[in-house]
Amino acid sequence: MTAKTKETIGVGTRSVPLSNPDKELFPDDGITKAELADYYRTVARPMLPHLKDRPLVMERYPDGFQGKSFFHKDVPDYFPEWIRTVQVPKEGGSVTMAVCDDAATLVYLANQACITPHPWLSRADCLDCPDRLVFDLDPSEHDGDGFETVRWSARQLGDLLTELGLRPAVMTTGSRGLHLLVLLDRRTDFDTARHFARRVADVLAARHSDRLTTEPRKNKRRGRLYLDTQRNAYAQTSVAPYAVRARPHAPVATPLEWNELDDPGLGPRQWTLRTLPERLEKDGDPWKGLSRCRRSLTAAEQRLDAL
């Protein structure tokens, strides 16, 4: 048995430990833990605004993406003191969760074989008040038209949200579908936000009942795309933009420009750990100005009532 190797990777002013760097997390592609860590160091600038100040759930794969995995909420005792943590209340006590405020933390999580970080939809200083809504466009497993229905659905939902005075953004999930994201001003609670999201989805599904549904039970969807709004609840998470997914070839959840939905070749796993950095270098971050798009739900609710 060979001894495990250790090295360090420089991230800002910190030297982050990297154990067993040659461990292959995606064996078919030869993608190692060191390559995962380097990827997250590379994309930290556009990714961190979507992680900062948020409790984080770590999706870990110690034996590679095809091996046993687990969602890790509580911070282990061995985590270094420089990683920020937050006490999150739960029934009967609390849980200590990591907060990824800097690139060094992001790289350290990669060393823990955290392939995919999942942040909360609210921030640590006001856990009950979401600052984003997420709509998950989940295609039918029997959808035979490729990704066309998902692209069409994103357009329809984006138009409706814009009609309500909101500023939605769209990204591939790196898995099966697309996410639409709406930034909020934190003046509402989760119950209100979730109810609003479900009403929006219901309106759109009623307009296109032959293609869309809000039915969570798969056997009731009859081949229609599922408009999933269930992530919009306290303690729920959503995959972070630019996060790697535990799927073949290490696809990445990728923010898009809206006009990219016009590309018939677009797919949910279009970009990977190895191709995304080149996209960023060439085209920049499509969501660079997203923080200026925060909106209140109050006016949007009034417009929705009037439909």
PLM feature spans:
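Short beta-strand
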Residues: 59-61, 168-174, 215-219
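Signature for HUH/AEP ssDNA processing cores
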Residues: 96-176, 184-192, 305
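Class II aminoacyl-tRNA synthetase-like tRNA-binding/catalytic domains
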Residues: 78-104
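A short beta-strand motif that forms the metal-chelation/ATP-contact edge
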Residues: 179-185, 225-229
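C-terminal accessory nucleic-acid interaction domains of nucleic acid-metabolism proteins
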Residues: 1-31, 35-38, 48, 52, ...
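Polyanion/phosphate-binding surface patch
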Residues: 53-86
